[in-house]
Regions:
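Short, basic/low-complexity N-terminal boundary segments at the transition from targeting/disordered tails
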Residues: 48-60
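Short secondary-structure junctions
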Residues: 66-70
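Feature marks short, highly hydrophobic, charge-poor N-terminal signal-anchor/signal peptide-like helices
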Residues: 1-6
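N-terminal glycine-rich cofactor-binding segment
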Residues: 62-63, 120
């Protein structure tokens, strides 16, 4: 076979494979409700690619830049210790909020490999404005440069800082909620577990399509399709980066992944929301089931036709996503009402 013919055959194979991928993508996207279709669905990204990750690290923090009028945003730092660096925080509050009142520690998403607290400016300032509470965002260290337990430790130290400074911050320590989205939701769940073990009060956990179980990577056919925003390839890279090694069936490191904890007894009430097209849907449903089985009140919302991150893309544009976020706010508001 001549070189020209070999290249021609190779080109035909690549073209055929590309056509098959495009066909599969369009077939998968056909199940997404028309109101939830967004250009992001047509641009699958592999965050295992260093160049893609570098660009995303610059772009993602800008996605939530808008701050609600009347909300003051300030930078704070959890002091460094002999073994840990300082942790940068953003606080959001209105001038007239009730003191002492409730507080939300909110942990951003990004697979533990992307993101920053400021990407949640719009969401955190909305909560501060509408509920009149203090919101604290955490700039935790990212993987793979900083594998476990770096991000977990940073978020737990932020919770301890919130408790230690509750009086100065105008916060009731009995009204502190921990929450987050995606990887931030998974970190929130492990922080809540550690807080329970160390006697640090947490009122409620607000988990938005949380990334809870590294063993999802080990499944041959993870729930959902590889074409919806957060893909199996990105999930595999993110867990490898966070764990510092590929996931294994057995991993006894405490707080490594929320779903690995055997005993969920005594954890605070929870709200878990996820879309039925989200790769995390099965692990989130299972965690909610186990919380309930352990005696913890847990409201589970599984949104039909919703893929990972759809609410952030379409809040205020698609009624279903506006309702999803409103449900989160309602759950948080109810949790912060004193008994």
């Amino acid at each position: 076979m001549t070189l020209r013919r070999a290249l021609g055959v190779l080109g035909a194979v690549v073209a055929l494979k590309g056509a098959m991928v495009i066909t599969a993508r369009h077939r998968a996207l056909a199940v997404v409700p028309s109101e939830l279709r967004h250009p992001a669905l047509y641009v699958p990204l592999n965050f295992g690619n260093a160049a893609v990750r570098a660009i995303a690290r610059q772009a993602v923090p800008l996605t939530g830049a808008t701050i609600r009028p009347g909300v003051r945003v300030e930078r704070c730092t959890v002091p460094a210790t002999a073994t840990n660096p300082g942790v940068n925080l953003l606080t959001y509050q209105t001038a007239g909020r009730h003191k002492p009142g409730g507080a939300l520690l909110w942990i951003h998403g990004g697979g533990t490999v992307l993101g920053a607290a400021r990407q949640e400016n719009a969401w955190c300032s909305r909560i501060a404005a509408e509920l009149g509470v203090l919101v604290v965002g955490v700039d935790y260290r990212l993987a793979p440069e900083n594998p476990f337990p770096a991000a977990h430790d940073d978020c737990y130290r932020a919770l301890r800082w919130l408790h230690d400074n509750a009086t100065d911050l105008g916060v009731d320590p009995e009204l502190i909620v921990v929450g987050g989205e995606s990887a931030g939701g998974g970190l929130a769940a492990t922080v809540v577990q550690r807080a329970h073990d160390t006697g640090v009060p947490v009122r409620f956990q607000l988990l938005e399509y949380p990334m809870l179980d590294d063993r999802t990577v080990l499944r041959l056919d993870p729930h959902g399709s590889s074409v919806y925003t957060w893909t199996p390839a990105s999930n595999r890279f993110a867990w490898n980066a966070y764990l510092g090694r590929p996931p294994q069936e057995r991993d006894d490191r405490p707080y490594i992944a929320a779903a690995r904890r055997a005993d969920l007894t005594g954890l605070p009430p929870a709200w878990i929301g996820v879309g039925d097209l989200d790769l995390f849907c099965p692990e989130d449903i299972e965690y909610a089931r186990r919380l309930r089985e352990a005696g913890t009140a847990c409201e589970l919302r599984v949104e039909p036709g919703m893929y990972h991150g759809a609410d952030a893309l379409l809040d205020g544009k698609a009624p279903a996503m506006t309702a999803f976020r409103t449900a989160m706010l309602d759950a948080l508001s109810a949790a912060l009402i004193e008994p």
